Amino acid sequence: MLKIFLLTLLMISYTTIADEGMWEPYQMEGLKKELRATGYKKNISNVSDLFKHPMNAIVSLGGCSAAFVSDQGLIATNYHCIERSYLQFNSNAENNLFETGFVARSKEEEKKSAPGSRVYVTLESNEITEQVLMGVKDETADIERAKIIEENIKQIINKCETTDEIECRVRSFYSGETYKLEKVLKIKDVRLVYAPPAYIGEYGGEIDNWMYPRHTGDFALLRAYVSKDGSSEEFNKDNVPYSSDSFLKISSRGVDDGDFVMIVGYPGRTNRLLTFNEIKYDLEFQFHEVVKFLKRGIDLINEHSIDEDGSKLKYRGLKSGYENYYKKISGQINGAKNFKLLESEKENWNNFLRFVDKEASSEDKQYLEELLKLIGKEQLESRSRSY
């Protein structure tokens, strides 16, 4: 299951030191020393409690992070996050918002989003590992284990989703070691307020994408609406702006050298705990297959998209997504090669194996051996299902 949790990327700009990685809010209390050393001076609870300001101002668009920036439902997010559901949906040959950009000078001018566009506000997050694994025993076969877990999750979600505006998700962390139940409010009426033209929002294109430094106006503004009684409803002219529990204030001062910077959001996943075998598999096989698949998709769109029938505009968002991921994976392959990543990871892995051989119990050694066998089996099956 996709591992999704709150990202906190801690960076300090006055030196070359950067403490980075994905951290859940509850882990912040254990990082007090590191936070203080990097310049964080406020109360740790400000970044450890998901349901207090400023953390509860952060929301998800179901694939992108965003934040409330006013008490009138105004949301700041990235330009690339609104290309398909907002710009492409509201564009045509005569009114191409990619070329002109868009600004609503009043709430009445704001544009509705494509069907299915949502803002997700987290209401609760609780660990439910015991409930998910209820009925699973050490001797339970893998297929039976999966069936039990699937049925338990269905029952948990059915019990949690009491109304249409509530969505509940069970998230798996650390490959099934921990499970959490997220209860979110689905805001169904989301409108476009502002987006720059593409020459600002996509400045540098795929040449600058994933590169540093980058100078792109990759931002946009949306607004969330609910019915007058506060319930979440689809687009309706009588809906009113959603009033969030808190919102972020945008500083006009900017940042100076030495300022503490923290990024908070809802990312996809982290793969920092992969074994050497998994890293090697990705870099020597899986990533190359993904690149070939994406390149084929980009070529097909270019081949069959022509201005006359408006297909270029219709497929612009999809093509942009393909190109973005293509650049990312290609860059990871080249970066790993340039920095001799496999060589260094092999050395780290050998050091780990020597430690295991010397310090681990026979039971732990057996667990590691079984894990590596399962990884090898999974990789063989993955090759057979390759793109």
Q: How should each PLM-predicted stretch be described?
A:
Residues I4-S13:
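Sec-dependent N-terminal signal peptides
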Residues T15-Y387:
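Terminal presequence/propeptide segments associated with secretion/organelle targeting
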